């Protein structure tokens, strides 16, 4: 049962990455009047709340199929992927997960850090994330102190959305899993949503329906 669950989760994650890629490709081809576009191919990608590295591994599998060029494959394995998580055990599991797929053999691409209080100036061309939802009871003060540009809120999902908006490069692409509340809540969430719609090109919203078994 456990193996089946892991297999299902990985398949869903890979499917999500493909959906993100296809959505961006369709949008870009429309903008460029039908020209093809490789949107997640051999660029630096990150997951700021990577968990055990499912999105990163799925992104790797997707990019690996795009070219057999040795130098591109080497770049992909050693320089293309970055992840972070604030739980030490999870970081170890993510590093091991990628290592078993020959990724980051010399140096793990997974950092043990809280992305919401990280003040580094690293920017990324592609961001894939399924951040934790809910209220951040601990650490809200640190977020406010380290990220004064953020709209102040204790909602994890809204803070991660703000973080993602701050680290995506101009012309970059983002695929992020968020709860419906990000689309409907008022207050701080509405302020962040307004900034998203004003300063970024939001072109695809997919809503997953859940079956109750």
Q: Positions of the model-derived regions?
A:
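N-terminal functional modules and adjacent low-complexity/disordered segments of proteins
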Residues: 1-3, 9, 35-37, 71, ...
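Conserved Class I SAM-dependent methyltransferase catalytic core
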Residues: 153-212
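Long, N-terminal intrinsically disordered regulatory "head" regions
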Residues: 63, 141-143
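Aromatic-residue hotspot detector
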Residues: 55, 116, 149-150, 211-213
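Conserved S-adenosyl-L-methionine
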Residues: 30, 34-129, 134-136, 154, ...
